[in-house]
């Protein structure tokens, strides 16, 4: 039986919990390092998910099947960089 992957929202909630624990500063150093590493990994996974979602939203097909960049209200292409 395969285990289901956590949703984006579940991963975000886990990351927020880790950040709160680290901000409190009352956990042992070894546990803090482990939690930090887990947080970094979750952060990378969440960033990848957001980038994939952005690609999906920013690339649309027009009537002649050409990719068209989605325009944001500010006139950009949605790139945060």
Curated annotation (Swiss-Prot):
Q: Output one GO BP term.
A: DNA catabolic process
User: Which superkingdom, per the lineage?
Assistant: Bacteria
Question: EC?
Answer: 3.1.11.6
Has the keyword Nuclease been applied to this entry? yes
Region (Disordered) residue ranges read 61-81
Task: Kindly state which reaction or reactions the protein catalyses.
Answer: Exonucleolytic cleavage in either 5'- to 3'- or 3'- to 5'-direction to yield nucleoside 5'-phosphates
Supply one GO molecular-function term.
exodeoxyribonuclease VII activity
Which Pfam family, giving just one, matches this sequence?
A: Exonuc_VII_S
- Name the UniProt key words of this record, in alphabetical order: Cytoplasm, Exonuclease, Hydrolase, Nuclease
Q: Mainly localized where?
A: cytoplasm
Q: Which Gene3D superfamilies match?
A: Exonuclease VII, small subunit (1.10.287.1040)
| Class of enzymatic activity (EC top level) | hydrolase
| Cellular-component GO terms for this entry | cytosol; exodeoxyribonuclease VII complex
Signal sequence annotation: none
List locations, semicolon-separated.
Answer: Cytoplasm
PANTHER family cross-referenced by the UniProt entry:
EXODEOXYRIBONUCLEASE 7 SMALL SUBUNIT
Its function, per the record, reads: Bidirectionally degrades single-stranded DNA into large acid-insoluble oligonucleotides, which are then degraded further into small acid-soluble oligonucleotides.
Subunit relationships: Heterooligomer composed of large and small subunits.
Q: Which family does it belong to?
A: Belongs to the XseB family.
Q: What is this protein called?
A: Exodeoxyribonuclease 7 small subunit
The species this protein belongs to is Levilactobacillus brevis (strain ATCC 367 / BCRC 12310 / CIP 105137 / JCM 1170 / LMG 11437 / NCIMB 947 / NCTC 947) (Lactobacillus brevis)
Organismal lineage: Bacteria, Bacillati, Bacillota, Bacilli, Lactobacillales
């Amino acid at each position: 039986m395969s285990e289901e992957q956590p949703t984006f929202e579940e991963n975000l909630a886990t990351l927020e919990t880790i950040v709160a624990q680290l901000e409190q500063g009352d956990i042992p150093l070894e546990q803090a390092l482990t939690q930090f590493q887990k947080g970094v990994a979750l952060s990378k996974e969440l960033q990848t998910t957001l980038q994939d979602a952005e690609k999906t939203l920013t690339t649309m097909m027009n009537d002649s099947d050409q990719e068209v960049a989605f325009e944001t209200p500010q006139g950009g292409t949605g790139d945060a960089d």
